[in-house]
């Protein structure tokens, strides 16, 4: 039920829609589902599967209308199912009206909604590298300055040092909570605040991350959102976190912190990789179990998950052990995969 672009069947395959989810609510209720997390259904040019939002207050026509969304919330509530939306507040689409205004001129009131810098001696403002590889800077020909994008160049980062950005996001959160949603899954939430724009230590991945990963400014933002918005509603927040330790996770979701309720960590999803699913190493079950036990013992409320839009199917990925397709054709492989599927199901549902 997490991914609305699968199997709804009311649009041409493989795209689904909100009406399709509504049609499956009885089935989901029968399964015992209590929460449906919707990946982004906002208006978007879909450079990054909806994580590039061009309008936070409307529904992408492919998925339906605001009326469909209100009906989904209402019908789900009748079945004691809550709706959680994706919240993407590190960046917007470059087609969002804020960014269109921002890039139009240095003196535009929306200029400081984003992070703009001039180049240095014909070079980019710093040496940071993107989550999607390559530099984080894109030169805009209108003013000759560069804008920061930790992800795609179509996803300019918001400037959380600007109080107006906070006010805009507070208003958006209230808009959806007043409509009746039950909370938010907060996308890459621990990278939203950039303490400085200095050059970073050169790394295999994410050069510059020491200037934006889990900064104190991020904690201040989350506490302010909790104080001014979330505490006024019966709602739930879970943060997707990047490269965090259990101690760092507790700083985000510890009961006394007043920030998030829960975190999604990637640690157990790195049992066959090195801090990045593209840097593969042989899978070892003991590595997976060790990480799960560590986080279970040390983190207040860690999400128990294996799959989402970022992760391949677990049984195929971990169950084949070497990760090679030909492993699946070996004698006994089918039985081994079935046992692994049962094991992961037990871990998720008990």
Predicted regions and their residues:
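Active-site and adjacent substrate-binding regions of carbohydrate-active enzymes
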Residues: 1-350
């Amino acid at each position: 039920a997490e991914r609305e672009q699968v199997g709804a069947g009311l649009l041409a395959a493989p795209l689904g829609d909100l009406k399709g989810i509504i049609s499956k609510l009885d089935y989901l209720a029968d399964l015992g589902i209590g929460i449906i997390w919707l990946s982004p259904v906002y208006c978007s040019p879909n450079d990054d599967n909806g994580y590039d939002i061009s309008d936070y207050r409307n529904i992408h026509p492919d998925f339906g209308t605001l009326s469909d969304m209100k009906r989904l919330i209402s019908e789900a509530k009748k079945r004691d199912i809550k709706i959680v939306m994706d919240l993407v507040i590190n960046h917007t689409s470059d087609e969002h009206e804020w960014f269109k205004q921002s890039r139009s001129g240095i003196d535009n009131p929306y200029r400081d909604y984003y992070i703009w810098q001039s180049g240095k001696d014909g070079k980019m403002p710093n040496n940071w590298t993107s989550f999607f590889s390559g530099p984080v800077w894109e030169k805009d020909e209108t003013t000759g300055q560069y804008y920061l994008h930790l992800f795609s160049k179509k996803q300019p980062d918001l400037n959380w040092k600007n109080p107006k950005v906070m006010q805009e996001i507070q208003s958006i959160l209230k808009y959806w909570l007043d409509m009746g949603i039950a909370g938010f899954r907060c996308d890459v939430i621990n990278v939203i605040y950039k303490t400085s724009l200095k050059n970073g230590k050169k790394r295999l991945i994410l050069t510059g991350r020491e200037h934006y990963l889990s900064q104190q400014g991020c904690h201040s933002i989350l506490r302010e959102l909790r104080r001014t918005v979330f505490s006024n509603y019966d709602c739930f927040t879970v943060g997707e976190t990047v490269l965090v330790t259990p101690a760092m996770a507790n700083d985000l979701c510890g009961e006394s912190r007043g920030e998030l309720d829960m975190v999604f960590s990637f640690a157990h999803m790195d049992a066959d990789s090195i801090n990045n699913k593209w840097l593969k190493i042989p899978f070892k079950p003991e590595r997976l179990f060790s990480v799960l036990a560590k986080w279970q013992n040390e983190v207040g409320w860690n999400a128990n998950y294996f799959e989402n839009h970022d992760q391949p199917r677990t049984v195929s990925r971990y169950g084949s052990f070497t990760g090679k397709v030909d492993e699946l054709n070996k004698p006994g492989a089918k039985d081994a995969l079935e046992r692994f599927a049962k094991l992961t199901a037990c871990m998720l549902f008990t």
